């Protein structure tokens, strides 16, 4: 096994014991500069991100081709955002599998679409019409970007959709959804799609230890993940306000920066701020969670049966908020409304029974992502159909 990734993830991969090939070594922060925006995204920022990705793509493709020429793999597993890998696999006639932690990012044909602010599915004519218009909006936005960048795309021989009307960026062999079917209301995924289950295994559980302070009645963990650099002050401000209103509770913040894990922990009364805490380290030791609705923390809360308040910030988080709300595993609040956050927090504290959360937590363990991946690799290498 060899992992191809950016410079920032080299240490992670080596620690896991895999060989690693670093892409764009001379541009160590190239990928993070695109993904880690300094403010909430909007259509203009999405266009700029796509354009910046397009700028890197020829160089990335060239490097992957060089690696594959030197040592051609039998099969490739690619994250859904690693689009250049698909181009190279097609050129080298290598079968590949797409893994996607946000399955609803795959464009839908008949159901309620994602990435339009967090739409709830409804079953009457007007909402069906809303869904149809929203699906058209998503599709036409993609087409517009591809039209604007048609010159660059033509050089890559890229078309947005295949003959089935499905997106070409995903593998025609196999797509593994790293989530739970029980949390999803969509049923219109491509035929090669399978639910593999969440991947929440700890990578750095031993990096920073958390010792719970028994003098507090309850412990609440707060995080907004890794990528939302612009929102780190916001999560601290929310924690400060809650810690003042609820002095009997301990509030623990993680800023999600593994590279800064050794920095000093800030402890002030009932508010503790860490630069990094692994979810497998902290979640078994707390009672509740306040988070942004990212896939990693959402499924980790299910894994450890932890009720949550979700405050969607950006990207797919509004859609995860919808799914968590419908599944009754969290209360959803608005980032720009302290009143909304406090209301959701109080609701979470007052709710005594979380039956569906307990049920999903048990189902979580039935998923075996690595087993399904192994089966798919065996099937494809034995000549399984695209």
Give the label of every model feature segment.
Residues 343-386:
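C-terminal amphipathic helix plus adjacent low-complexity
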Residues 179-288:
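Donor-nucleotide binding loops and adjacent catalytic segments primarily
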Residues 76-78, 276-322:
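A donor-sugar binding/catalytic signature common to diverse glycosyltransferases
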Residues 97-185:
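Active-site-proximal region of nucleotide-activated glycan assembly enzymes
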Residues 324-328, 336-352:
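C-terminal "capping" alpha-helix adjacent to the active site of nucleotide-linked donor transferases
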Residues 34-85, 90, 132-166, 170:
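Conserved nucleotide-sugar donor-binding subdomain of glycosyltransferases
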Residues 3-49, 127:
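Conserved nucleotide-sugar phosphate-binding/catalytic loop shared by glycosyltransferases and other
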Residues 55-128, 182:
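Conserved nucleotide-sugar donor-interacting segment of glycosyltransferase catalytic cores
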